[in-house]
């Protein structure tokens, strides 16, 4: 049974990666720009470089993670990102683009992710999830203004 579940997971991930890659190949230059922005944020977070919060997040940011009782703000993001950074390490991660829609100075980006991490007890875990991010372009640069999503429920 375990092998079957792992095979289904592997095929699902491969299909998601292929579908995302195919979609990204037809993206406009501006869509590719916001996808690079997303990738940069994930790289910085994995490297425990929390400067992304000050440079890539709008002061009026609101976000709602799965499992949280209510939306939170930039100060909460900074607080909990610091805690998570001190207590876990990303071993590997990958994000798969699904859609990117841009209207004027607003962009909506949707994607799926997979993360392998290790906590302070040296316990390893792999999770998958999804996000919808809302970006705003001010003074020529994109910033996160909202997002919703997070880890998929474990069965």
Model-derived features: positions:
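Short beta-strand segments enriched in hydrophobic/aromatic residues
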Residues: 57, 113-115, 148-151
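Short, low-complexity N-terminal intrinsically disordered segments enriched in polar/charged residues
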Residues: 2, 19-60, 155
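A solvent-exposed, acidic/Ser-Thr-rich amphipathic alpha-helical stretch
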Residues: 32-35, 49-103, 112, 124-127
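Beta-strand elements of well-folded, non-transmembrane domains
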Residues: 115-119, 135
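A short, structured loop/turn motif at beta-sheet edges
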Residues: 100-107, 123, 135-141
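Bacterial N-terminal signal peptides
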Residues: 8-17
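A short acidic/glycine-rich loop-to-helix N-cap element
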Residues: 25, 120-126, 154-155
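Short beta-strand edge/turn micro-motifs at domain boundaries
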Residues: 128-153
